[in-house]
Amino acid sequence: MLFKMTEPEAKPISPPRSEITLPCRDARGSPLRLGLGDEIWQGHILVTGGTGSGKTTVIRQLLARCRDIWPDASFIVLDVKGDYIPYRRPGDKVFSFYGGEDAFRWNILEEARASPHPEDELDEMVSVLFASRVNTAGQNRFFVDAARQVFYGYLLVTMRQWQCRAGRPAPTHAEMAKWLKKCTLEQMQDRLNFEKDELGGVTSLLKGREAASILSEVHLFAHDFFRGAGDGCDSVAEFLTHPGRALYLQYDAARAESGRLGCSILLNRAIAQLLSKDWCRRRVVFILDEAASLPADYGLERLLALGRAQGARVLCAFQNQDQVEAMFAGRPSMQSDANNVLSQFSSVMAFHPNSDRDVEFARARLGKTDMIVTTFGLSRYEPPHAAAVQDCPVTARQLMALKAGEAYVRLRDYAPAKVYFEKEQCDGK
């Protein structure tokens, strides 16, 4: 069997002129500068490949180049395995449970205050924080949704009392956690009664037979959300006013639920700032390695679909379709939502896959092209049979034969090709 591409003319594999390039070698071993400038970033970049395939090393190099060439851009980096934080630069911040001199200590009340409509912003943040819990609650959905309303009521009262005391700092997460973890049903009712006219319906939830179960849900959420909480008054809105800085979100697998909550809400706030009508359309680059570690409730679909004109540039790394669908677990439209997200990426880098599912995923994302398939008969007297088909120009065998650092790339409308990325050091702290 013989495959033949039917492209009318040879295309380059990347833009001939680009402000950002990575050193690599083509399939023949010749040096090549792969163009990955803004023309490519505007269509977002998808990276596939298994563990140890070299994709993180290449992403790290690309991040360093972007920071050098775009000094006025902001960067949000999801760091699941600690591969990026060692390369941080002066002025960068790290969100984690371990503190440190450059720690980003987020405060939900300070984040709300940065908005022109702080109470609406607070309600939106609480909805995002509870979204995954509500979607996966099943028959317990009532209790989780009621806990969301109670938690919002508590934060609303706390914020209004703080705003009445001019000049005083916002209550810290540590202070709020200390009160929430030990509060009784009566204490929570008394707290909500400070805004009785507005929160009367919420207070009534704590007077029925389900009151104890609802408060228990609040305690469970507070335990996860405030785990490792400390003193601090940082906000994403304020962070993004400083060009050239990077915020690293250190997802800790040992504290999976707390990590999901913290990283998801910070991504959501960055996306909300980017999509607001007041945003200055300055570039914000999102590097989401191991993106499937977080549910998509933080607004990934909106970021990809609407963010380009506002300055969003997104790189996501997935291994297979199952990972993407798992981000939408609990939604009736899980599969279609996953496909919608994947359709937003116009450039693909496919590194060595680890399984058949990974191979299928990479070939599907690399796309199809017109090909002539010629089948030769068993007898020399039998004429060959030729048929026109559409198929991926990269075979499963070719993908499985990739070595560490090698990848098949398809950048927007350019031709797919195999490249080997050169190793180099990334400047950092």
Identify the residue ranges that each predicted region occupies.
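Interdomain "pre-motor" coupling segment immediately N-terminal to P-loop NTPase/helicase cores
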Residues: 1-5
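P-loop NTPase motor domains
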Residues: 7-14, 18, 24-32, 38-312, ...
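Conserved ATP-driven motor cores of ASCE-family P-loop NTPases powering translocation/secretion/packaging/pilus
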Residues: 304-408, 412
